[in-house]
Amino acid sequence: MTALTASVLPQHRVTSSTSALPQGSVRYRLADAVDVIAGEEGGGMLFSARPLMALRLNASGVGLLSGLSASEGRTLAEVAACVPELSPLAAAGFLEELERRRLLVRQPAVPVAWPPVSIIVAAHGRPAATRACVQSLLSLDYPSERIEIMVVDDASDPPLAAALVGLPVRLLRLERNIGQSAARNLAAAEAGGELLAFTDNDCMAAAGWLRDLVPYLGDPDIAIVGGRVIGPSATGAVAGFEAVRSPLDMGFVGGPVGPREAVAYLPSCNLIVRRDVFLACRGFAADMRLGEDVDLAWRVLRSGARVHYAAAGTITHDHRARLGALLRRRADYGSSEADLQDRHPGNGRIMHLPCAGLLMLAALAAFPLAWPAAAAMIALAAGMAAIEGIKKRRRLRRIGLAVPATRLAASIIREHGASLYHLGHDVTRYYGLPVAAVSVLWPPLLPVAAVIMLVPPVCDHRRLKASLSLAAFIGLYWLEMAAYQLGVWRGCLARRCYRPLLPLIRWRS
């Protein structure tokens, strides 16, 4: 949850990533629940209702945004024309800054000519699924003469050639299994497309997959774009859980990708990358069987290019519907963290510790033992929240915005609730098993452990609108987290790298 802030966005600000003006007729619109409020003397503010946020704007900023709404976008040229004295490059930098803050939504331009795309499917076994995958690719709503479909048969037994008879694909057969990463790299080296699109043979592409995602690469700064990965219609508790909790689905909101962003990586089953960038970065790390997609995105980011997630361009993945398979895969994913931290030591995990929330949890543990001390902790936490509210209200009044006290209080409560949610998620994912064990040995800690480990699944069950019961969802959530945690420990021990368990601590007042 973003804290309430007030700041000045100067008219001359140009972001360092803006190397060229956006191409074509890319459009910008206000994000949902965001409004431009004009003030006196030409200035004003950009106001977000949820999360509660206010950004002060000068006259140029108000002029640029005055014609935008949440329902209709405008091109950069149309926006820049509102303030003729401002250069289009400066206007582009200003809009990009707001997009990064998720206050604006960028709608990519449709290319004048669709670029050639090589679609690469690295396959091992699953002949029927491989044929179905290729058939979905042949049904894409994209100029057929601009598509090359390449299937790398990574030493399948029996070979996949028989399953692909009659389909116009380029089949590369390997007699020795080299793994998905190396197989993809092999195909990329021989591909003829300007763009490389990756998916897996247990996936089905939506008809608009390429048309939805390729336009984002009209921005010369974006090197990789990826879309949503969803599951088929769910039947059963495990399938219903995986449908809303799959680590391949990056959610409903698009935006920049990076280790410090809301979306940290893009899965390789729905990934489009510029071929020249892919080859310059030497492709996927061939020695990685897991986490290779995270590693690729982070290396591309390190080169100075951008990676973007679009909540469109969907791929349907055949999710695991059996509990054992789901837990094994989560453990495998967890085991890749140590390898990734070894390769990217600067991308360590950050753990935010909310001071007021920790005081409330400490009071919960102390109450049976020393209730006066617990009451004092509760009073201190409440006082901290009250002071926070007073400061924010004063800050809002200074920029001319009157927010009702009830609305401000609700915003602060949501913010602290979100902090507790993220704390609970981190603790459950990385330390849940020892916390549970210590709680059994020292019962006063049980209520604290219960709150920490119940808040995230209860919130997710409601937020994600899971089809299974709350009790089943909580149980599967805990099992999933325990499996991932064991995988993290396994990877740490194997690589003798313990950074995944030692996050950077950031305190929140």
Placement of each model-derived feature along the sequence:
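Short, acidic, metal-binding catalytic loop of nucleotide-sugar glycosyltransferases
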Residues: 135-146
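Active-site-adjacent helix/loop segment of glycosyltransferases
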Residues: 310-374, 390-468, 472-480, 486-490, ...
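Glycine-rich, basic loop-to-helix element that forms the pyrophosphate-binding segment
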Residues: 174-191, 201, 212, 252-264, ...
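Short aromatic/hydrophobic "clamp" motif used to bind/position activated sugar donors
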Residues: 196
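N-proximal low-complexity "stem/linker" segments adjacent to membrane-targeting elements
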Residues: 50-64, 81-136
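Conserved donor NDP-sugar-binding/catalytic core segment of glycosyltransferases
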Residues: 208-240, 318
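Acidic, low-complexity/disordered tracts enriched in E/D and polar residues
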Residues: 1-67
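A conserved acidic beta->alpha catalytic loop
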Residues: 153-161, 176, 203
